[in-house]
Every structure is written in structure tokens, then in C-alpha cells.
């Protein structure tokens, strides 16, 4: 393990987050439904959804809610960073492709979580755990649960997120100017 500042701790994703949690909601509520093709690649957290009744959106699908972070578990979507920070869903709930892994922890900065699972080390390590036939390979869920992350206090998570966003804004500005 690498050294972290004194007020940080090393934790495993599975001990910090609920992985693939379920939602309890009335079946007749409107909910989001997000198939894979409605999720953008490339660390943008851009997605769109269809509105369905909760009974249909949840049945046989991955469930998620406002505040969750979701990322693809199947190749090549995982490497392409098809991922999203879920917010402003109808009635704060949704269902979608079974090819997603969901992380939930309301006490961790959502953007910090998003950047952790977008990190090149996380992606490279996940690819090493692939199983299945070519074109249908998936990362091992145990890899996700056991992945070690440095966890700073919430104020430091926010500072890190702000710095990442500053750097991305510079990159986007530079690429737009070119």
C-alpha cells in the first residue's frame, strides 16, 4: 500500500459501498429506465432515460437511485468508461441494463466515487479479471468489492473533485481552442 495522509484511511470498495443495492418503492410509481445505449462513454456522466412504471423498470434489471454511481461491467463498455452519477431520476429511482455495477453510499462525495471508478488503475485491474467469451467479457464483482481506495475526509474529497474538474475544464478549453 502507498502512504496516505494521516487523516485518510485505506478501505475496500465493498466495505464502504452497498454494491448493487435494491430499492423499495410502489410498483405504480414512475421510474427511469436506462439501457446501455443511453449511457455515454468517456467519463462524461451523460445519460438519458425512458420513463416506465417501477414494476417494469425493476423487473429483471439492475436497480439504482439518486446519489448512486453506476458503471458498465461488460467489455468494451467498461474500458470505454460508460458510467454515470445518477441524479434527478423520476421519484429518485430507476432500473436498467443488467450490465451495470451500482455503488451506493450517501456519506461519500458522489463525484469522488465517480472519479475513483474512472481511474486508469481501476480500469486496467478490472480488465485483468475479465471472464466470459470475447465480446461478452465481464469484470469480476469480487475485484470491485476488494478494490482498495484511499478515503480522505469529506472536505478533502470535495477539494480533490474541484481540482479534477478544474483540470478537465482546462483540457476541454485547450481542445476547443485547437
Regions found by a protein language model. Name each.
Residues 21-28, 79, 121:
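Proline-centered turn/helix-capping motifs that create local helix->coil transitions or kinks
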Residues 14-25, 32-69, 86, 91:
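Sequence-specific dsDNA recognition surfaces
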Residues 147-152:
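Catalytic cores of nucleotide-enabled group-transfer and carboxylate-activating enzymes in metabolic
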Residues 1-24, 154-161, 169-175:
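Non-catalytic DNA-recognition/assembly elements of restriction-modification systems
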Residues 60-62, 66-118, 130-135, 141:
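A short beta-sheet element
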